[in-house]
């Protein structure tokens, strides 16, 4: 029987393996009582590291201690927070792009898209002409680390003069210079 053939909400029992059977028999001998209705158990460790067990089997002893069975998965809260922030930023960017597209009222017919691409390629050709002019003129590199210039030239494949201008424009900030040139 495949997964597609099992109706949703059907009562499906999983056959436990030999070790699980032995552990459950020992639990019954110890007098532990099963607690129903628990959907998730988490154990927190230093550094926002969390071990999570989804759909656990939880037993309670007379002394008040708990025994938990299930598959533990490491759940890093810092990673979850970073993912949530990235997802939120992506949603905001999509909303902003949708608002910009709606406000501009641009026609997205094939002819309009072709015209936009041609316009962009013409503008790109003009910037290439500017880059050719940058190659011919000397640029003052004082106050800028030559290794930074070399790295930007290597990463963006622009002229050395363009890299120096971008670094000076952003006060030596390599990240912003790279973003501008790429």
From Swiss-Prot:
Keywords: Cytoplasm, Nucleus, Protein transport, Transport. GO terms for molecular function: phosphatidic acid binding; phosphatidylinositol-3,5-bisphosphate binding; phosphatidylinositol-3-phosphate binding; phosphatidylinositol-4-phosphate binding; unfolded protein binding. Residues 17-81 form the NAC-A/B domain. Its main location: cytoplasm. InterPro entries: EGD2/NACA0like, NAC-like_UBA, NAC_A/B_dom_sf, Nas_poly-pep-assoc_cplx_dom. Residues 131-141 have a biased composition (Acidic residues). It comes from the Eukaryota. Coiled coil: none annotated. One of its GO terms (cellular component) is nascent polypeptide-associated complex. Gene3D superfamilies: DNA helicase RuvA subunit, C-terminal domain, Nascent polypeptide-associated complex domain. It is found in: Cytoplasm; Nucleus. Transmembrane segments: none annotated. Pfam families: NAC, UBA_HYPK. Residues 144-182 form the UBA domain. CDD domains: NAC_NACA. Residues 120-148 are annotated as: Disordered. GO terms for biological process: cotranslational protein targeting to membrane; protein transport. Signal peptide: none annotated. Component of the nascent polypeptide-associated complex (NAC), a dynamic component of the ribosomal exit tunnel, protecting the emerging polypeptides from interaction with other cytoplasmic proteins to ensure appropriate nascent protein targeting. The NAC complex also promotes mitochondrial protein import by enhancing productive ribosome interactions with the outer mitochondrial membrane and blocks the inappropriate interaction of ribosomes translating non-secretory nascent polypeptides with translocation sites in the membrane of the endoplasmic reticulum. Part of the nascent polypeptide-associated complex (NAC), consisting of EGD2 and EGD1. NAC associates with ribosomes via EGD1. Belongs to the NAC-alpha family. This is Nascent polypeptide-associated complex subunit alpha. It comes from Lodderomyces elongisporus (strain ATCC 11503 / CBS 2605 / JCM 1781 / NBRC 1676 / NRRL YB-4239).
């Amino acid at each position: 029987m495949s997964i597609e053939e099992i109706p949703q909400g059907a009562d499906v029992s999983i056959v436990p393996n030999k070790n699980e059977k032995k552990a459950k028999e020992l639990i019954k001998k110890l007098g532990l009582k099963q607690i129903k209705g628990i959907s998730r158990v988490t154990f927190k460790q230093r550094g926002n590291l969390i071990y999570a067990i989804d759909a656990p089997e939880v037993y309670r002893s007379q002394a008040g201690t708990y025994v938990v069975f299930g598959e533990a998965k490491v759940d890093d809260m810092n990673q979850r927070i970073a993912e949530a922030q990235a997802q939120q930023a992506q949603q905001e960017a999509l909303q902003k792009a949708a608002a910009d597209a709606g406000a501009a009222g641009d026609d997205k017919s094939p002819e309009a898209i072709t015209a936009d691409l041609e316009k962009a390629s013409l503008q790109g050709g003009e910037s290439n002409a500017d880059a050719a002019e940058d190659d011919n003129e000397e640029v003052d590199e004082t106050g800028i680390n030559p290794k930074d210039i070399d790295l930007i030239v290597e990463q963006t494949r622009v002229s050395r003069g363009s890299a120096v201008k971008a670094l000076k424009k952003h006060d030596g900030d390599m990240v912003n210079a790279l973003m501008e040139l790429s």
